[in-house]
Amino acid sequence: MEAGEPEGLVVRALRQVSGYGRQGRSWTSPEGGLYCSLLLRPQVAPRELPTLSLVVGMAVRRALVALAGARAEEAVRIKWPNDVVLAQKARYARFPEATEIRDLGFSESGKELGQKNRAQRLFCANEGDACSARDGRAPDFAKLCGISLEAHGGGVCVGVGVNVLPPDKRPDVGGKNRPAYVADLADSVAAPAVAVEAVLEALLAAFAPLYGVWRRNGFAPLVDEFNAYSSLNGQNVRMVDRADYLL
C-alpha cells in the first residue's frame, strides 16, 4: 500500500496461523475458509468510510445468494457494523448436525423473497459485537463472515473472512462467535479449493458494482437494500463501551 499499488489488488491466504481481530483477539482460520484482503483507494468523503464495511457485507450476501439461491436469500443477513450472519431459524438452514457433505450443489441466482427477520430484543456491546437477548439467551444467528477495514498508506485494506467449509470437528464456540458455514446452505459441498474459489469469484463479482455506486454516490443509494437484510431489524440495541458505559 505504501509503495503506491493501485486499487484492485486481492491477496488471499489458504489459512492463517497468527490471525487476530479487534483488541488483539486471536482468530482461528483453518483451511476451508476464504481469507482475503482487498486494496482500495476510494476518493470519498471521510464520513462515508465507515459504511464501506456494510457495502462489503452486502456483496458477501449477494454472492451467497448467487451461489445458494433461495436458501441464502432467506437465511443470510448483514449484521452491523462488520459481520454477515446466518439466521438459525430460517427454514432452509442446516447447522452442526448436518455433517455429511460431499459435492458443491450451488444453484443459479436466487429469487428475491424479501422476508423480514423475526423481531427479538437484543442488547449489543462494543459496536454491536457482543449481543444477547434480554433473558440471556444467545442471538438467533451464527457468524458466516467477518469484515475489517484498516486505513494505511493512502488506501484502505479490506479484510474478508468467510466460513465456507466446516472443519472435521466444528469449534465449540457459543454466543456472538458461534460459526456458520456456506456449506450449511448447500445440499452438498465440493473439494475445498473448488468451493472457496467459487465464493471468492462470486464475492468479487458482487462487490464491483456495489463499490462503484458507493464510490460515486455514497451509501445513500444502498440504504434500502441494507435495511431489507439487516439482522437487527425490529430489535432494540444498546451500545456500551469497554467499561460498560452506555454510549
Residue ranges and their predicted role:
Residues 185-245:
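Conserved, helical-rich catalytic subdomain that frames metal- and/or nucleotide-binding sites
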Residues 80-86:
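Glycine- and Gly-Pro-enriched alpha-helical subdomains that act as flexible
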Residues 12-14, 37-39, 79, 148-150, ...:
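Short beta-strand segments
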Residues 153-186:
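Short, acidic (Asp/Glu-rich) active-site segment that either coordinates a divalent metal cofactor
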Residues 1-75, 89-96, 100-106, 113-115, ...:
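N-terminal lobe of the biotin/lipoate ligase/transferase fold
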Residues 88, 148-153:
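Short, low-complexity Ser/Thr-rich regulatory SLiMs
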Residues 145:
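Cytosolic ligand/metal-binding cores
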